[in-house]
Design a protein with these regions (language model features):
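Hydrophobic alpha-helical transmembrane segments of multi-pass integral membrane proteins
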Residues: 1-169
């Protein structure tokens, strides 16, 4: 009716099929992050050890950056993508909502892009890592909903989601 306000359901029905499954977007982000991490690490090693390039002045020691990128940048995308896809099947639960995994994907992806920019503009470092944490935390409520779904075997899903929660801390 004219003038009547109606709630509209947010949906991605018109989006490409790529966005309709959590593992697709998260695995792409993880693979991209893996390639970017390898490129950055190769650049750093070539500069520091082979002396092929000018040594950059990073805001953190290079081994710390490498550890951060691998531990919190590369692997989590694959873990989130897998658990958001397989977890509901293990637990006979409803699938993870599109907005849950797409918001996590967007925030974590933006955070890691910001992190790479922060390597040259250190003032962006906390903002970038804050976006990564926000994305990580955006995914957790949906995963905890799946983990708390009653089923015969919850040990595995509780361990994985508990580990992801611990990783956010």
């Amino acid at each position: 009716m004219p003038g009547e306000w109606r709630r509209s359901k947010v949906t991605i029905a018109r989006a490409p099929a790529f966005f309709h499954a959590p593992h697709r977007v998260m695995f792409l982000a993880g693979a991209t992050q893996g390639l970017l991490t390898m490129l950055w690490w190769a650049f750093d090693l070539a500069a520091r050890h082979a002396q092929l390039l000018a040594v950059a002045s990073w805001p953190l020691p290079a081994p710390w950056i490498h550890a951060l990128l691998m531990t919190f940048g590369f692997f989590p995308f694959f873990i989130f993508g897998f658990v958001m896809t397989a977890g509901p099947r293990w637990q006979a639960a409803a699938p993870v909502g599109e907005m849950s995994y797409l918001s996590a994907f967007a925030l974590m992806g933006a955070g890691w892009m910001g992190f790479y920019a922060a390597l040259w503009m250190p003032r962006l470092l906390l903002l970038a890592l804050g976006l990564v944490l926000a994305g990580w935390c955006a995914a957790l409520p949906a995963l905890w909903r799946v983990a708390r779904t009653p089923s015969n075997e919850q040990t595995h899903i509780l361990a994985v989601v508990g580990g992801l929660t611990f990783g956010a801390v």
